[in-house]
C-alpha cells in the first residue's frame, strides 16, 4: 500500500506483479511494462538476484526486508530509502493521464497489461460517489474534498492479495476517498485474524472473492459467538467467483445492516453490473443490474438492449 501511494504521489506508473509467476513470466512482465524500479519482498531475493541481468531496463531493485534483518543482496533496502526522505511533497506535475497498469493473470496466454488513466479509474469508481448508496458523484476535486471534510472516511479491508485486481482496486478506491486501507501481516488468509482486525479498526467495508473467503469468515463467526464485533461493516463486496445465497444469509445473521454486493467486472471494464442482498431483500441467485458503462453489441457492432432475441 505504501508503494502504491508513493507511486501515485510521484506520478509514477504502478504495476501489479503476481508473486506466483515463474521466471519466464516475471521477466516477460517486467520487460513488457518497461519497469525501471522493482520492489520485492526479501523472501524472493534469491529468485530476483537470478534475473537481474536479463532485465537491463530496471535501474533500481528495492528489497523490502523481513523485520530488521538484511539479506546479502546488493540491492537497495526499502526502510533505508524511506529514512533518507523528509516527507515533503514531491515537485511533480500531476496529470489526468497518469497511468496505473493492471496486469491480468495470463489466462489467455501471457499476462496482458490494462492501462488505466487515473481520471478514468476515478470516474469509473464513482468519482467520490456511490450509485449503490444513492450518493451522487462529485463534480470536481474541490467538491470531493469538501464532502470528505464532512463525512466519516471509509476503512477498507481487502482480503484478496493487493497484487490481484480486486484487492488492488478496492485499496485504491478507499485511499482516493480519503480513507484507510487495512492490510494483514499473514502470508495466507486467516479468517480469525481478519475478523480481529475488522473489530479493532472498525472496518466499514470488506472485499472478498466469493465463498473461498466468505465461508471461512462465516465458520469463524459461528464458532466464536460474541468474540468479534463486525457491526461497523456496512458492505462486503465480492468479485470473480460464486458467492452463494446460503453463505450470504449466514453472514447477515451476524450483522443485519450489511449490504452484500456481487460485482460484475473485469480488468478492462469496471462496474458492468451489481447484485445486492440485504436482510430485507433475499435473492436465490445473483442477477446483475447492469451498470451505465455496460453495453452489448451484435456482430455488426449494433448495440443490443435488454430483452433482445439476438445474441451479442
Language model features by range: what are they?
Residues 9-82:
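Structural core segment of the AMP-binding/adenylate-forming
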Residues 99-137:
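Conserved AMP-binding A3 loop
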Residues 5-11, 32, 164, 175-176:
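Short hydrophobic alpha-helices that are characteristic scaffold elements of the AMP-binding
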Residues 34-36, 53-67, 88, 150, ...:
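Conserved helix-loop-beta element of the AMP-binding
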Residues 85-103, 109-110, 146-156:
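Conserved pre-ATP/AMP-binding loop-to-beta segment of ANL
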Residues 295-312:
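Conserved beta-loop-beta connector loops within the AMP-binding
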Residues 79, 106, 176-179, 203-208, ...:
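Gly/Ser/Thr-rich phosphate-binding loop
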Residues 123-159, 163-205, 220:
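Conserved AMP-binding/adenylation subdomain of ANL enzymes
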Amino acid at each position: 500500500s505504501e508503494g502504491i501511494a508513493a507511486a501515485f504521489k510521484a506520478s509514477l506508473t504502478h504495476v501489479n506483479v503476481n508473486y506466483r509467476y515463474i521466471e519466464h513470466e516475471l521477466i516477460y512482465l517486467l520487460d513488457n511494462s518497461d519497469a525501471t524500479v522493482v520492489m520485492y519482498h526479501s523472501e524472493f531475493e534469491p529468485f530476483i538476484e537470478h534475473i537481474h541481468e536479463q532485465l537491463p531496463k530496471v535501474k533500481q531493485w528495492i528489497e523490502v526486508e523481513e523485520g530488521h534483518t538484511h539479506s546479502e543482496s546488493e540491492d537497495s533496502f526499502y526502510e533505508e530509502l524511506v529514512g533518507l526522505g523528509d516527507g515533503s511533497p514531491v515537485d511533480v506535475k500531476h496529470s489526468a493521464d497518469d497511468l496505473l497498469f493492471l496486469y491480468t493473470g495470463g489466462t489467455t496466454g501471457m499476462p496482458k497489461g490494462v492501462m488505466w488513466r487515473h481520471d478514468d479509474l476515478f470516474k469509473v469508481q464513482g468519482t467520490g460517489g456511490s450509485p449503490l448508496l444513492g450518493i451522487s458523484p462529485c463534480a470536481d476535486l474541490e467538491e470531493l474534498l469538501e464532502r470528505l471534510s464532512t463525512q466519516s472516511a471509509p476503512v477498507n479491508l481487502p482480503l484478496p492479495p493487493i497484487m490481484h485486481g480486486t484487492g488492488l482496486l478496492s485499496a485504491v478506491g478507499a485511499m482516493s476517498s480519503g480513507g484507510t486501507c487495512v492490510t494483514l501481516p499473514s502470508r495466507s488468509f486467516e479468517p480469525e485474524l481478519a475478523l480481529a482486525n475488522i473489530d479493532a479498526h472498525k472496518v466499514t467495508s470488506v472485499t472478498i472473492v466469493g465463498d473461498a473467503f466468505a465461508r471461512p469468515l462465516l465458520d469463524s463467526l459461528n464458532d466464536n459467538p460474541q468474540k468479534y464485533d463486525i457491526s461497523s461493516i456496512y458492505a462486503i463486496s465480492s468479485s470473480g467467483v460464486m458467492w452463494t445465497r446460503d453463505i450470504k444469509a449466514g453472514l447477515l445473521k451476524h450483522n443485519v445492516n450489511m449490504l452484500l454486493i456481487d460485482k460484475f467486472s473485469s480488468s478492462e471494464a469496471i462496474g458492468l453490473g451489481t447484485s445486492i442482498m440485504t436482510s430485507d431483500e433475499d435473492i436465490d441467485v445473483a442477477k446483475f443490474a447492469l451498470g451505465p458503462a455496460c453495453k452489448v453489441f451484435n456482430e455488426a457492432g449494433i448495440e443490443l438492449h435488454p430483452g433482445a432475441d439476438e445474441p451479442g
